[in-house]
């Protein structure tokens, strides 16, 4: 069952779902909570490696990832990040989210931004039960013009679903959880897959 706005407010009041900083009530509507863009970004260096062998040996994949990912880019207040057509970049939400073991979250982009070509998450929009940390956004500009993105702008909306029971393997308890407690735009850790 997806939570409605009054249930979301109740879960926040009871600290069953924790969003920090806590959204004001005008950011909670229908079945979602608006989230904002943080100030941490990463981009891909062009032509730093001819390809990434996703199923290659870990050492090779690690070396290729190291070549293609930029260092973390931290924007100052009011500064813009420009996402050019055809580019992929990583960023984070301003808010940190903590979910209990019996709730799954979903991130959706804003329709107004999608109509300009901005994809907020390329595929990974599920927030696992037991998650704690900022949400990494996988931005892609499918439009024709560069897009200026600024920290604190409304970027997406979270919704929440109650599971049939508590997850036996919540994210925060898994030893193989690669992005546990993330607070910045962490690049792919596919090389840590088992």
From Swiss-Prot:
<feature type="binding site">
    <location>
        <position position="171"/>
    </location>
    <ligand>
        <name>dCTP</name>
    </ligand>
</feature>
<feature type="binding site">
    <location>
        <position position="182"/>
    </location>
    <ligand>
        <name>dCTP</name>
    </ligand>
</feature>
<dbReference type="GO" id="GO:0015949">
    <property type="term" value="P:nucleobase-containing small molecule interconversion"/>
</dbReference>
<comment type="pathway">
    <text>Pyrimidine metabolism; dUMP biosynthesis; dUMP from dCTP (dUTP route): step 1/2.</text>
</comment>
<dbReference type="InterPro" id="IPR033704">
    <property type="entry name" value="dUTPase_trimeric"/>
</dbReference>
<dbReference type="InterPro" id="IPR036157">
    <property type="entry name" value="dUTPase-like_sf"/>
</dbReference>
<feature type="binding site">
    <location>
        <position position="128"/>
    </location>
    <ligand>
        <name>dCTP</name>
    </ligand>
</feature>
<dbReference type="GO" id="GO:0006226">
    <property type="term" value="P:dUMP biosynthetic process"/>
</dbReference>
<dbReference type="GO" id="GO:0006229">
    <property type="term" value="P:dUTP biosynthetic process"/>
</dbReference>
<comment type="similarity">
    <text>Belongs to the dCTP deaminase family.</text>
</comment>
<comment type="function">
    <text>Catalyzes the deamination of dCTP to dUTP.</text>
</comment>
<feature type="binding site">
    <location>
        <begin position="110"/>
        <end position="115"/>
    </location>
    <ligand>
        <name>dCTP</name>
    </ligand>
</feature>
<dbReference type="GO" id="GO:0000166">
    <property type="term" value="F:nucleotide binding"/>
</dbReference>
<feature type="binding site">
    <location>
        <position position="178"/>
    </location>
    <ligand>
        <name>dCTP</name>
    </ligand>
</feature>
<protein>
    <recommendedName>
        <fullName>dCTP deaminase</fullName>
        <ecNumber>3.5.4.13</ecNumber>
    </recommendedName>
</protein>
<feature type="active site" description="Proton donor/acceptor">
    <location>
        <position position="138"/>
    </location>
</feature>
<keyword id="KW-0378">Hydrolase</keyword>
<comment type="subunit">
    <text>Homotrimer.</text>
</comment>
<dbReference type="Pfam" id="PF22769">
    <property type="entry name" value="DCD"/>
</dbReference>
<dbReference type="InterPro" id="IPR011962">
    <property type="entry name" value="dCTP_deaminase"/>
</dbReference>
<feature type="binding site">
    <location>
        <begin position="136"/>
        <end position="138"/>
    </location>
    <ligand>
        <name>dCTP</name>
    </ligand>
</feature>
<keyword id="KW-0547">Nucleotide-binding</keyword>
<dbReference type="GO" id="GO:0008829">
    <property type="term" value="F:dCTP deaminase activity"/>
</dbReference>
<keyword id="KW-0546">Nucleotide metabolism</keyword>
